[in-house]
Regions:
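Short helix-adjacent coil turns
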Residues: 104-111
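Catalytic adenosine-cofactor/nucleotide-binding cores of aminoacyl-tRNA synthetases and other
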Residues: 1-83, 178-184, 248-257, 266, ...
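Short amphipathic alpha-helical coiled-coil/interface segments
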Residues: 55, 93, 97, 116-121, ...
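Core structural elements
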Residues: 53-66, 86-96, 114-135, 300-305, ...
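Short alpha-helical scaffolding segments that buttress acidic/His motifs in well-ordered protein cores
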Residues: 26-34, 62-65, 116-120, 128, ...
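C-terminal low-complexity, glycine/proline- and small-hydrophobic-enriched intrinsically disordered tails
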Residues: 49, 178-385
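Acidic, turn-prone loop/beta-hairpin segments
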Residues: 32, 71-98, 129-240, 263
Length: 385
């Protein structure tokens, strides 16, 4: 809640107890993730527990890779991968490496930790491994061998980037996932720059000053692949948009519905055909088709400039869904009104602790976000009706 730790208040959090319960790496990552410059750390056991779960997620991903024979082949070069999915993970890994490196160099450790959290949890685990499953579970092929090597390569890059924040977990995974020449702590930073002469400059007017060493930034252009990012990014955003729409409109996961890609270009049609099985499995779709205009009674989603239509007439009870959304909207409005009444009370604002006021503002923001989603769902319902 933002209160200062005090023995007299009895609100001191013992770090040794946190380490016993959640591990040293989880506590270390928590402190790094919350250590924004110029801001106090509001420590809570829930945050430490959340980052313990993050460590567990990485451990399970490494086990999944091992169980599926993912190992880094000798001479493997991710920049020469032929599969779109593997070129995409190389592109995303290079981007994460650049962003983490820049954040660490600028002492923005919270930004670096946040980038690693999103990359590991969302990009690597939730999307890359999930999209790679059909290939891994299929028959042996060059595509499967390349995917196995790419998964192992990306995992190793993650261990290097995450090592400053979770040294014990990453060192253990480094040791057990492959035969290594040395410790992870001594490994080179990912995507190291090629050898280049360093430039030494002396500070003018001070002969005793130490020279300044200027080192080139890491070269990652060879991993950049806008085409792969465009294809996999479109796929991820489309599936995410369909899932969000399904949740907003309270459509059960067991209910399948068709997808119509409106005015699709040749490129979009090719993507849809390549990834149709994945889209049907992850978005819970029936047939995927193409049309020049959206069918009547359909919800339309705009994904990277492309229109995806989902016919919902007969799929859901429109009248019952509108009643439910109206009730949710009234509840959100009541929550906003209640918080506004408190924050509009000068006596309350003057006497309440700062953390209580912050908590009320957070409640209002949450209610506003909920209201915006409900209004969006109601607009979609109008399109269907």
């Amino acid at each position: 809640k933002g209160a200062k730790m005090s023995k007299s208040k009895g609100n001191v959090i013992d770090p040794l107890h946190l380490i016993d319960d959640y591990g040293a790496d989880a506590l270390r990552f928590t402190l790094a993730a919350m250590a924004a410059q110029g801001r106090d750390i509001k420590l809570s056991t829930q945050r430490v527990e959340g980052y313990r779960n993050f460590a567990t997620k990485l451990w399970n991903a490494s086990r999944f890779a091992e169980m599926n024979g993912c190992a880094l082949a000798d001479g493997f070069d991710p920049s020469k991968a032929r599969e779109t999915l593997n070129r995409w993970i190389a592109h995303e890994t290079a981007r994460a490496t650049r962003e983490v490196t820049e954040a660490i160099q600028a002492y923005r450790f919270n930004d670096a930790a946040g980038i690693m959290y999103r990359f590991v949890w969302n990009i690597y685990c939730d999307w890359y491994l999930e999209l790679a499953k059909p290939v891994l579970m299929g028959a042996d092929s060059p595509a499967k061998a390349e995917t196995q090597a790419s998964i192992a390569w990306a995992r190793d890059e993650i261990l290097k980037l995450l090592h400053p924040f979770m040294p014990f977990l990453t060192e253990e995974l480094w040791a057990v996932t492959a035969k290594r020449d040395g410790l992870l702590a001594l490994a080179e930073w990912p995507l190291k720059a090629p050898a280049a002469p360093m430039i030494e400059t002396a500070i003018a007017g001070d002969p005793l000053a130490m020279p300044v060493i200027v080192v080139p930034a890491p070269e990652i252009k060879q991993f950049s692949d806008p085409a792969a990012e465009a294809e996999i990014g479109w796929l991820i955003e489309l599936i995410s948009a369909i899932r969000s729409m399904r949740a907003e409109m309270n459509i059960p996961p067991a209910t399948l519905f068709p997808l119509v890609l409106v005015g699709a270009s040749t490129d979009i049609k090719s993507r849809a055909e390549r990834w149709s099985d994945v889209m049907k499995r992850l978005a819970r779709l029936g047939d995927i088709s193409f049309a020049d205009r959206a069918p009547d009674g359909s919800v339309q989603l705009l994904v990277r400039g492309e229109v995806a239509a989902i016919p919902l007439k007969g799929v859901i009870d429109l009248a019952a869904e509108k009643v439910r959304l109206d009730k949710e909207l009234a509840k959100a409005d009541a929550d906003i009104k209640r918080v506004d009444a408190k924050l509009g009370n000068e006596k309350f604002v003057a006497n309440a602790p700062e953390e209580v006021i912050d908590e009320q503002r957070e409640k209002r923001d949450e209610a506003e976000a909920r209201k915006a989603k409900i209004l969006e769902a109601l607009e979609r319902l109008k399109d269907v009706a």
